[in-house]
Amino acid sequence: MLYPQHFDVIVVGGGHAGTEAALAAARMGCKTLLLSHNIETLGQMSCNPSIGGIGKGHLVKEVDALGGAMAAATDEGGIQFRILNSSKGPAVRATRAQADRLLYKAAIRRRLENQPNLWLFQQAVDDLMVEGDRVVGAVTQAGIKFRAKTVVLTAGTFLDGKIHVGLNNYAAGRAGDPPAVRLSARLKELKLPQGRLKTGTPPRLDGRSIDFSKCGEQPGDGMPGGMSPVMPVFSFMGRVEQHPPQMSCWTTHTNERTHEIIRSGFDRSPMFTGKIEGVGPRYCPSVEDKINRFADKDSHQIFLEPEGLTTNEYYPNGISTSLPFDIQYALVRSMAGLENAHILRPGYAIEYDYFDPQQLKSSFETRAIGGLFFAGQINGTTGYEEAAAQGLFAGVNAALQAGAQTSWQQETWVPGRDEAYLGVLVDDLITKGVTEPYRMFTSRAEFRLQLREDNADMRLTETGRRLGLVDDARWEAFSRKREAVSRETERLRSLWVSPKNLTATESERVLGKSIEHEYSLADLLRRPDVNYANLMSLEGGKYASAELNIPVSRETPAVPLPEAVFAAVVIEQVEIVAKYAGYIDRQIEEVGRAAHYENLKLPLELDYLQVSALSFEARQKLSKHRPETLGQASRLSGITPAAISLLLVHLKKSNFKGFAAAGKVTAPSESGDVQQGVI
């Protein structure tokens, strides 16, 4: 039957990508339908019980700055919080949280069920309704047809999924869930380029059978013995009192006996016997892959992570495996503290279809089928955080195409590489594609000094407001913070000290040496050995801000007052901006030089095969990938700065719109530097 109600946006799949996509489209005012094979598993953490980490935490903060759910759900479900790289610069500091699976899933479900404009429906999708070259809806396994203006596919590992344990394998989307075989076949019928990838998960352990006295304890920040006495929050709107009771993680190690056991199972490993065709994640390898690749290492650290407050289940992070169960049993029991460990669920690898993200437009709409958007593992990525960010992004663009009424004046929203890690993620996928599951690192962002966790709201919340993603409460909180940062920055610039009014003793106490001429407090704060608190102690606190002079205790994990938290956040932002101003200014100059190419749209009718000045390889790659801008073209593998210059010459001679007036140009080199050239 044809369902009588029509929708603006249909989202297929209720994982981390699907839930963020559906919430985003609904927040923008679109009538949105979320289809899932099982609404009891909406927001389920299929693998590890954690959110965030290096690069990944940055994405979560960006999703949150745009009104997304992941960070807020983690604050409500997180049972351990840590700031990674806390001793390093702010650009690479990252929040990571262990989450109670049930609490996290419940927090996501609650948001979905209370979101206006959002409908849930439990049915697996087997087919897409396509008219001409445009999608117009989806068909469920029961034959129910739902019509919509746009469709977002977020199928995760379900597309023709196959689970491997040793030499045994069976069809599944994940353990306990059926695969989406018919939907995968339908996508292949549409001639969308696809491949196979794989990922894996470790066996789960019963905590009652673990001897924790033989393991190392790893408490979180704000817990007794933690690295910091201050407990973090993930969301910009989060509060520490939202966190449930906290738990420690634990560590153990593999040993030579463990490695011998693993090697003894290589002849029955689906990885080494050719049973698995898909490529696995380089940065989250299986334990058998680690032992094979790093044969010189005699030990690997394993983290025992609690799955929740109401379960004894533990996730042994570091021993993801598809080895036969008898090998899994033996390798687990070969480690200290796990000699009597009981396995609750076996580890496994899962192989699944993905579709080449280079066939997507920059909005994540497929080039072949109008109105069809992809997000998450279907694009070749791995990780909850990468999926959530893509889901929000695809949901926004699907909503814009469906006619969302917002103050955004453009047909699509695509953040630049200098604006967000989400922009880096999108650009990497559509220009470089994937040959293995893609995960985010801070090293992928050339402008990472600007793309910090602490300023994700400063970068994106105003855009989110224009897109209709940000509610009044978040907007008011953000505006208050932004105004306070601006006021304090200007105040520090306006206050001056000189040798006349600052004694040498006082100067040496705070600044390390006496000053020789007049300085503003903003200038002094730029010094690496001067922090805000010390600066405000000058002359008995004479220069302290009445607005921000609220003490925050760092001696105990007690919950500080909201005003003290606000003051600490503002002070952190003021101090970081002051200390990194020179570096950030240089990056802004680089962004400006590159912006010319990002704004030069390549003509849709351009036949690259006829640009005879280009090498055959360059013509082939440009024809295949059809980059939307000159900036995208410059980042394609095999496209050199010389090729970009030659392409510019051709465009100018051919009088394509926007290129006829080109004169002196700056062609980006493969290293990202800028080279001067003339055409």
From Swiss-Prot:
Residues annotated as binding FAD: 13-18
Pfam families: GIDA, GIDA_C_1st, SAM_GIDA_C
Keyword Flavoprotein found: yes
Required co-factors: FAD
Annotated residues for binding of NAD(+): 280-294
Gene Ontology molecular function terms on file: flavin adenine dinucleotide binding
UniProt cross-references to InterPro entries, sorted A to Z: FAD/NAD-bd_sf, GIDA_C_N, MnmG, MnmG-rel, MnmG-rel_CS, MnmG_C, MnmG_C_subdom, MnmG_C_subdom_sf
Localization in the cell: Cytoplasm
Keyword rRNA-binding on entry: no
SUPFAM superfamilies linked to this entry: FAD/NAD(P)-binding domain
GO CC, alphabetical: cytosol
BP term (GO), one: tRNA wobble uridine modification
UniProt keyword annotations, A-Z: Cytoplasm, FAD, Flavoprotein, NAD, tRNA processing
Main location group: cytoplasm
Family: Belongs to the MnmG family.
Quaternary context: Homodimer. Heterotetramer of two MnmE and two MnmG subunits.
Function: NAD-binding protein involved in the addition of a carboxymethylaminomethyl (cmnm) group at the wobble position (U34) of certain tRNAs, forming tRNA-cmnm(5)s(2)U34.
Protein name, as recorded: tRNA uridine 5-carboxymethylaminomethyl modification enzyme MnmG
Gene, per the UniProt record: mnmG
